[in-house]
Amino acid sequence: MLSLSASAADVGAVQRAKALAELMVLDTPDEQSFDDLVFVAAKACGVPIALITLLDTDRQWFKAKYGLDVCETDIEHSVCRIDIDKGDLLEIVDLTADARTKRNPLVTGEKHFRAYAGAPLVLRSGAVVGRLCVIDTAPRPAGLSEMERAMLQALARLASENLELRRIAKASERLTELQTALVEIGEVIRSSSGTEEMTSGTSAIVGRTLATDR
């Protein structure tokens, strides 16, 4: 059970969905800059699993993963979403003993999740889109050390900034594509011998350009 009120959670979910749409990152291929962060997180915290988790409306999708062989799971099974809109580090030292997670299939099933810590991914807009988390297959009664917590939070900030920079780069690429399309349309208009040729040429350019948004 999540601790936020339904209304607050709804607002956070709407803000998150909007931010993820703007990031244009869901279902994209692996990227070394993100893969490196989960590798370092796992090694720094001494755990077998680390993930950069983005919380979509009906699933949690992993932009980067270390030690896990799936790309996403149902949002209902997400530990990362617990108290997500508080924007704080979440740590559960024994997932089998916590009422919020003890019946989670990722805990009771073959994945055998036992301990969890996740730092929020907070964008410049304030939207919290997910967590950088580390997971152990054995309980950790003492939890993370102060240094490990600080490292996890620092890596989460780097992941958040990486998401922002990726968005800016993609927006710049898109602007270049649109500018190129306008130049091509101008050339078609100048070189066309008639309306039919002009319409056909410009339609092809517009169709190709819009297709990249899908």
Q: What do the PLM-derived regions correspond to, one by one?
A:
Residues 1-32, 158, 162-191, 195-197:
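Signal-transmission linkers at sensory-effector interfaces
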Residues 18-19, 49-50, 55, 59-65, ...:
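Regulatory sensory and allosteric helical modules in signal-transduction proteins
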Residues 27-60, 76, 183, 188-214:
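Helix-loop-beta substructure at the N-terminus of cytosolic sensory domains
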Residues 49, 118, 131:
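Short hydrophobic/aromatic beta-strand element in the GNAT-like acyltransferase core
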Residues 114-125:
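A short, aliphatic-rich beta-strand micro-motif
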Residues 131-142:
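Short beta-strand-to-loop transition segments that serve as allosteric relay/switch motifs
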Residues 143-164:
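Amphipathic alpha-helical "output/dimerization" segments
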